[in-house]
Amino acid sequence: LFDYDFKPMEEELGIDCFTKIENYQAIGKPELMYNKNVSEKVQALSERLEKTANEDEFFDHVTQFYKDYGVGMFGLNKAFRISDNNGKVEFQAINNMEKVMLDDLVGYEIQKKKLVDNTEAFVQGRKSNNCLLFGDSGTGKSTSIKAIVNEYYDQGLRMIEIYKHQFKDLSNVIAMIKNRNYKFIIYMDDLSFEEFEIEYKFLKAVIEGGVETKPENILIYATSNRRHLIKETWNDRSDVQVDNGMHKSDTMEEKLSLVHRFGVTINYSKPTQKEYFDIAIELCRRLGVELSDDEIKAEANKWELSHGGISGRTAQQFINYLLGKQ
């Protein structure tokens, strides 16, 4: 096929499309270009096929490609979201996912190790738990989960992002992926519920407590600024009883039972000022900002006072500001 001469056909039909294809030069993509990951893999396969000596070698390359990456959008994409098409749940690939790795997140080594240990057990087929990453905003919870997907994508890990209003579709989503030859993280960002919201009951039933056994290729990873996910009010304590010195409240237990369904909970707390300065200095060194440590500390301190306080996100925004001035 690669040696076939299309010129006689083009002359007969008065076309030149095959000549254009044969001389096509792909446009270079910057690092964060949409879907670069997919096009790189297809391009690599094309180059291997071009060098094949015979049909058997051609067949081996193609079958190995599908063995490594699977077929369809699950094969070539890392992350997905769901949509409702006239009552039918459909997956949509997220083509512009941030290409962040765990080493890009400065600090939080204990937290990252707990997340890595659980995820490695999952992709290797060992027992693992649903994870809740909770703590102050801007501390790297969402970044850690995105990085985990990037780190373990080549081992068959995929991510499906689901929003709170879509929890009613969770059972359908699980039914669609439970027999796939991939490991799926169902990702819920900024998970929390007001006292009047009942969507958490869908989530509780899916995580544990339903009749059907949870598939071994699915875990739920969630982030939240709240430790207990569901907002409590003093009314929740209205049914508190005293029984042999123990306080009990059915309403409180009902709400707290959701967080208990996450076997691994990881606290991402706000950094101290020293840790904040360390993050800012490390990011400056990585990205080539030419300031002394003392200058970075002074500027970072002024920045956080007027931009929402100390956090890893504040440090990153400060670095972006410095890079924009260069």
Predicted regions and their residues:
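Conserved P-loop NTPase mechanochemical-coupling segment
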Residues: K99-D103, S142-H165, F193, K231-E232
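Conserved nucleotide-sensing/catalytic segment adjacent to the nucleotide-binding pocket
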Residues: L157-I162, S171-P215
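Interdomain "pre-motor" coupling segment immediately N-terminal to P-loop NTPase/helicase cores
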Residues: A26-F91
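Conserved AAA+ ATPase "SRH/arginine-finger" region at the nucleotide-binding site
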Residues: Q241-L256, G263-F277
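Conserved catalytic/switch belt of AAA+ P-loop NTPases
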Residues: E194-N244, D250
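N-terminal pre-Walker A segment at the start of P-loop NTPase domains
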Residues: I94-E120
